[in-house]
Amino acid sequence: MTSAHEIEFFFDCSSPWTYLAFHNIQPIAAALDARIRWRPFMVGGVFNTINPTVYASRQHSVPAKSAYAKKSLRDWARWSGVEITPHPLTVFPVNSVKVMRGCLVLDREGRLPAFARAAFEAYFRDDVDISQDDGVRKVCAVAGVDADALLAAIADRAVKDELRANTDELIARGGYGSPTIFVGGDDMYFGNDHLPLVQAALLRLRGH
């Protein structure tokens, strides 16, 4: 059961806004002595199931809105102290399934945060294609993870099933994208810009 001292953070390393939220939620949790329960999932699986129009919207975006979205991302990155490449990514969107399975494997050892951070930085700062084994190896090198062991572990059926189960669970709970955060069990928040509301919800649950 989720308590007032736990945050569930459903995330996919393919999203730049999730990168910001991953970075920004950690000091909030630390300040409130709240535990983050990391919940890796595949945002593409969510889109395919309940939000397929996202693909069409990317193909037929409003130019002014797209330009402002890029500016907003740069502004938030600067405010957060996160470095994101100013150049278009070589591969976008990226298939992040290997690193998300890796997150599941490493979460059991308490090593998920360092690995996920390295994956976010590799993709959004250094333009590394994290869908490929070579990209995963670069992430592992930064995070201090045995790449051969991890690549073998993520091929396990149980790991694949767990990632699919997390994705299905998020859909069942009303989620539609990344990052999705739950406080107190079923109080859902979406996006980096809602982290102040996450903080307020944690305080409210504690009677503040």
Protein language model regions, located:
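C-terminal cap of thioredoxin/glutaredoxin-like
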Residues: 3-34, 39, 118-208
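Structural alpha/beta surface segment adjacent to cysteine/selenocysteine redox centers
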Residues: 20-123, 201
